Amino acid sequence: MRDLPFGESVRSTKKTLCRIQDPTIRFWFRVYSPHRSRWTTFSVAERQALVHDHASTVFEDYCRARFPGAERYWEGRVELDLVAPDPDDPKGLLVAEVKWRQLSVVERDAMRRNLETRWERCSLRAQYRRVRFDVLDASILRPRP
C-alpha cells in the first residue's frame, strides 16, 4: 500500500511511504520475523511491547477508515496521525491524535494542546482555516449505551 501525506498528489510528491496493508502479514514482517531467532528468549514484557506497537498501527488504520478521505500527514518535524475532511463541517478539516489506550481527561487535554501546537508549525495550516482537533483513544471501541 502506498501512503501519501494528506492533500498530496501521487504525481507531485516524493513523500511516499510503502507499507503492507494486511495487518497479519505486516505483523509477520515487522514484529515476528525480524526477531524470530530471539523470540523465545524475549521476556513477556518485551513481546508485549512489540505486539502493542503493532496493535497501535492497526488501531490508527481503523480510526482513519472511520473518516472518508482520512490520511496521515508528515512534513519536516511534524507528524499528524489523522487528517480528514470534517464530517460535521464541509469546509473544515478534522485533525486528530490517535492513541491505542484509554486516556484520562487530563491526558486528552494535554494531547489536544500538543496537537494544536504541532498544527501551528504545519504548512497545511495556510490552506485550512477551519480546523477541529480531536484525540481518539481506545474508548471509541466501547459500545455506546
Q: Predicted regions span which residues?
A:
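Accessory nucleic acid-recognition modules appended to NTPase machines
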Residues: 1-79
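Short conserved micro-motifs at the rims of enzyme active sites and ligand-binding pockets
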Residues: 30-32, 95, 107-108
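Hydrophobic, Leu/Ile/Phe/Ala-enriched alpha-helical segments that form helix-helix packing faces
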Residues: 63-67, 115-126
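Conserved catalytic cores of phosphodiester-cleaving nucleases, focusing on short active-site segments
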Residues: 67, 80-102, 115
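Accessory DNA-binding and partner-docking regions appended to nucleic-acid-acting proteins
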Residues: 75-77, 109-114, 127
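Switch/connector loops and helix/strand junctions flanking conserved nucleotide-binding motifs
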Residues: 91, 104-106, 141-145
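Mg2+/Mn2+-dependent nuclease catalytic core
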Residues: 101-121
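Domain-level recognition of nuclease-like catalytic cores that cleave nucleotide substrates
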Residues: 124-145
